[in-house]
Design a protein with these regions (language model features):
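Acidic, Ser/Pro/Thr-rich low-complexity regulatory regions
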Residues: 1-121
Length: 121
């Protein structure tokens, strides 16, 4: 009974890890192709890397962009802001994305290579 439970737990963990790795790959590729803006991408990647005990620290531009945008309100919290404040935050986010765009594209190549070579960085 216990052995079967442990097998099921291990299978579930492997399935979850595979799903997380696939999501990491999809988001990084979407960032590379422009389907996902870099701000949203770094926020999502940060969350997906956490279960593996990893961060974006090896990728300084992605890490810096995350540091700038991760506390910006989203969804309902964003809707509650006055239009002027929303515009100010949008401008700050867009400025940061533009500042790091070239470096992030370079880092994404390395990030995707790292994921391939060792599963998850």
């Amino acid at each position: 009974q216990l052995k079967q439970q442990n097998i099921m737990i291990a299978k579930s963990k492997a399935i979850r890890e595979a799903r997380l790795k696939e999501s990491i790959n999809i988001i990084a590729r979407a960032m590379q192709s422009g389907e996902c803006n870099h701000s949203e991408g770094v926020i999502r990647l940060t969350m997906l890397l956490m279960p593996f005990g990893k961060t974006l620290t090896p990728y300084p531009s992605m890490a810096q962009l995350h540091e700038i945008v991760h506390n910006m309100p989203t969804h309902d919290a964003r809707k509650q802001l006055e239009k002027k404040e929303r515009m100010r935050l949008d401008l700050a986010r867009e400025r940061a994305e533009a500042k790091f765009e070239h470096e992030i594209k370079e880092e994404l190549r390395q990030f995707l290579d790292d994921i391939k070579q060792i599963g998850v960085i």
